[in-house]
Regions:
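Short, solvent-exposed loop/turn segments at secondary-structure junctions
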Residues: 130-132, 181, 209, 277-279, ...
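Acyltransferase donor/substrate-recognition loop-hinge adjacent to the catalytic core
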Residues: 3-6, 152-230
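A conserved beta-strand-loop-helix scaffold within acyl/acetyltransferase catalytic domains
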Residues: 24-66, 74-84, 205-206, 211-313
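TRNA-binding/sensing appendages of the translation machinery
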Residues: 3-44, 113
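Acyl-donor binding region in acyl/amide transferases
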Residues: 84-166, 285-362
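Catalytic core of tubulin tyrosine ligase-like
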Residues: 376
Length: 378
């Protein structure tokens, strides 16, 4: 296969889209660190008739072949709303995987760059998805660490190829292991109580799934406002919020959700959503809920986990840096201890987001992964 010509083909059929998704699973089938996503969810994300992100974005997908064997994939995404908001002409690359072959990589990125120029774009950057809730960033440190459901894993040769092609650092995300203390840190407890009284806040917990539905829309509204300043973020549309609510709410573990509201009007001021790690369960499921995938996932979801993943933490801008995060973790730390949690995976945090990283000052933490967004002028 070494001397075979590399051919690039645009994905135009559902069968080809399935092959696009499955290539990631095939490439990493022997990796102990890669966490495969659910094939059905990935197909929904990439399908123009199912993902409401296509109301504000357009995309193209390419596969690289040597003979009849797929050796690479890449998506080009133009988020029109993000470009309009920030007056940019950017294209994103994402959903990118490839064998360690310079010709394959060059031709894959060449196809997206050519399409980008045809569309009048000026800068290509990524890996990014359609929204901030898709996978972001290419792993550059931590290749011997188990991945999470919320983040990409890639082989260590990926970033070297990007640099070889003239791509440079745009921004990094850092990931931490946050070791759970046996008790709520004294300062956290004190700050949380002061904040609760000063701003008239209360903590909401859910015992039945139906109780969370009235808050779901408000949680995402708060997410839109709290994430507005973050790299690559685009405000979610009402249809996108509905899409994510229906996708994620059914799989949440209720005791690991904390919502902070104003007592006077029940407005969602902040929230913390975490889950027992599903990494090993997803590896066993191999991309499918059936025949046994859903059993592996349910067992992991309702187990006594040693690891939890912090998926989403958000606080309204006017309440940021005022101690609301302390209220969230004052609630979650006892929950984690009761479940036997040793540490939490922070998942990607922007290196420039000092406020979010400052909240770990009172915890033992370990920086174990770094991922990068690359860019290149076209």
């Amino acid at each position: 296969m070494e001397n075979m010509e590399v051919l690039i083909k645009e994905v135009t059929t559902k069968k080809e889209l399935m092959r696009f998704v499955k290539f990631n699973h095939e490439l990493y089938k022997d990796s102990p660190y890669h966490v495969p996503g659910l094939i059905a969810e990935e197909l929904m994300t990439l399908s123009k008739d199912k993902n409401p992100a296509f109301e504000i974005a357009e995309a193209i997908y390419f596969l690289a072949y040597k003979g009849d064997k797929i050796v690479g994939r890449i998506a080009g995404i133009i988020n029109r709303r993000n470009n309009e908001t920030y007056n940019k002409k950017n294209i994103r690359f994402g959903f990118v995987d490839f064998i360690d072959d310079a010709e394959v990589v060059d031709k894959l990125f060449g196809a997206v760059e050519c399409w980008a120029k045809e569309k009048g774009m000026e800068i290509i950057h990524g890996p990014l998805g359609f929204t901030d809730l898709d996978h972001e960033g290419m792993l550059i440190e931590g290749f011997d660490q188990l991945g999470t459901m919320a983040a990409l894993y890639n082989f260590d040769y990926y970033p070297a190829h990007l640099k070889r092609m003239g791509y440079a650092k745009d921004l990094d995300w850092q990931e931490f292991k946050i070791y759970i203390p046996k008790e709520v840190p004294e300062k956290h407890a004190r700050v949380g109580e002061i904040v609760r009284i000063k701003y008239g806040l209360k903590t909401i917990k859910f015992r039945k799934r139906k109780e969370i539905w009235p808050y779901a829309q408000r949680i995402f509204d708060t997410l839109n406002k709290s994430y507005a300043h973050l790299y690559g973020f685009t405000k979610l549309t009402p249809k996108q919020i509905d899409y994510y609510v229906k996708m994620y709410i059914p799989m949440l573990r209720l005791d690991m959700i904390t919502v902070i509201v104003r007592e006077e009007d029940d407005a969602v001021v902040g929230f913390g959503i975490s889950l027992p790690t599903l990494s090993r369960a997803l590896q066993k499921a191999k991309g499918s809920m059936f025949p046994l995938g859903f059993i592996y996932l349910l067992r992991a979801l309702y187990s006594k986990p040693k690891i939890v993943d912090l998926y989403l933490i958000g606080v309204l801008p006017e309440y940021q840096n005022k101690g609301v995060n302390a209220l969230i973790f004052n609630d979650l730390i006892p929950v984690y201890n009761k479940a036997g949690v040793v540490y939490a995976e922070s998942n990607p945090e922007l290196e420039t987001n000092n406020a979010i990283q400052a909240q770990w000052d009172y915890f033992k933490v370990e920086h174990h992964k770094t991922r990068r967004a690359f860019f290149k002028k076209l």
